């Protein structure tokens, strides 16, 4: 396993965490100032994994972000024998290293889309990058969807013109609730097992995916920061959040990987919304 690759990827995910948290706190401050409120701040808690490594969970509950969590983790060790065949390259000895960032934002306003993002770097006897970002509006708007996709397309096109259509398709297929026969949101990009034999290029692409998210999502939030919404719209948001819960517990690879590798349960399930209704 390449020690330098581990260090620079882990360092980037920490840096991206700091940039995202700073921007989200800034949005809370902007809103709080106009409403005479005390702005919310992220609360951080560290955790250690018994088999090796650990992470830091950053959680904020505010007036704009009902619940937003930004997790970073770097874990290593051995995957238990019953799960080794599910992780490429771990079949023989089960050794693995994984570092990454995951982010889920649930907004108070039903007019502002929920958002999920993660990027990661994993080493077994093989190595690869994965991740992506997707948007889940409760009241979709075409211009907003186009803007979100355009940010990721620009990041993709810098490296390979085939990336965006391929990763968009993978996102549409991945964030699909098979039991309901419906998509979770309006998509984005999703990639996994990315290894083109050029670590620097694959890492640069993964960094640009993070920068794309940082540029576009705060803009979307700010555009609807002060729009009024109704009790009926909030009720609909709570019901639709149920789809988020269903996907994360039934299909999400990150949830499964975290549980298979004895990750921190609170951090793994951080993506669940703070309030939801099942009718």
Swiss-Prot record:
It catalyses: coproporphyrinogen III + O2 + 2 H(+) = protoporphyrinogen IX + 2 CO2 + 2 H2O. Disulfide bonds: none annotated. Residues 244-279 are annotated as: Important for dimerization. SUPFAM superfamilies: Coproporphyrinogen III oxidase (SSF102886). GO terms for biological process: protoporphyrinogen IX biosynthetic process. One of its GO terms (molecular function) is coproporphyrinogen oxidase activity. The active site is at residue 116. Its EC number is 1.3.3.3. It holds the Pfam family Coprogen_oxidas. Substrate binds at residues 102, 118-120. It is an enzyme of class 1 (oxidoreductase). InterPro entries: Coprogen_oxidase_aer (IPR001260), Coprogen_oxidase_aer_sf (IPR036406), Coprogen_oxidase_CS (IPR018375). Gene3D superfamilies: Coproporphyrinogen III oxidase, aerobic (3.40.1500.10). Its cofactor is a divalent metal cation. Keywords: Cytoplasm, Heme biosynthesis, Metal-binding, Oxidoreductase, Porphyrin biosynthesis. One of its GO terms (cellular component) is cytoplasm. It is found in: Cytoplasm. Its main location: cytoplasm. Involved in the heme biosynthesis. Catalyzes the aerobic oxidative decarboxylation of propionate groups of rings A and B of coproporphyrinogen-III to yield the vinyl groups in protoporphyrinogen-IX. Belongs to the aerobic coproporphyrinogen-III oxidase family. Homodimer. This is Oxygen-dependent coproporphyrinogen-III oxidase. It comes from Rickettsia africae (strain ESF-5). The gene is hemF.
